[in-house]
Amino acid sequence: SAAAGELTTVEAGKLTMATNATFPPYEMTTDAGEFEGIDIETAQAIADKLGLELQIDDMDFDAALLSVQQGKADIVMAGVTVTDERKAVMDFSDSYATGIQSIIVPEGSDIASPDDLAGKKIGTQRGTTGYIYCTDDFGEDAVVAYDSGLTAVQALNNGQVDAVVIDNAPAKEYVAANPGLKVLETSYAEEDYAIGMAKGSSLEDVVNAALEELKADGTLQSIV
């Protein structure tokens, strides 16, 4: 594996990861204020392979995507889906997990499939693929963007929106914590998660090599 001396990172000796730690089970904060989740463990394993200390910076999802573009973080991991728009402004590692966009509705809702979202108010998290897909499919007027998935779910509970479109993993957690809500069986979309980096980042090859090793030795499968 690459020696840390050869790697240029935002802060010498550290792998700085931008994330949005409101996204269980990929990243969340424990009651003690520590970060945990699939992305955190994967980033830690990569940092270990590269001989770097992992530094985690928590911020809004939008800001996390921008931070690598602005050279404030080395990588962004926040359940980030590879899209053509994002590829235009950043580079991505190989995929390390698959995500599903799901629809949360109240019990008894007449929304039973993605098509039923037409004419409804849809809550999403700003900057996410759920937001992008919904605005593409139903227009910006139909979609309300919130700072976090949690806020979107609160708006659904309060009747401000008719449904929330968000990744399946946090969707299940939010529904478990909010009686009266359910996740539709039909998914809205499927997508690949990857690690985002600045355009032309020198880390891309070593991060992919580390991911390859973590897949080969079973570490990644045990995390995801």
Regions of interest found by a model, annotated:
Residues 40-49, 121, 128, 194-224:
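Extended ligand-binding regions for polar small-molecule ligands
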Residues 40, 56-67, 109, 126-129, ...:
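Short helix-initiation/N-cap motifs at beta->coil->alpha
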Residues 21, 97-105, 168, 172-212:
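Periplasmic-binding protein-like
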Residues 80-88, 133-135, 157, 161-189:
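A ligand-binding cleft/hinge motif common to bilobed small-molecule-binding domains
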Residues 44, 53-116, 182:
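Acidic, polar ligand-binding/catalytic clefts
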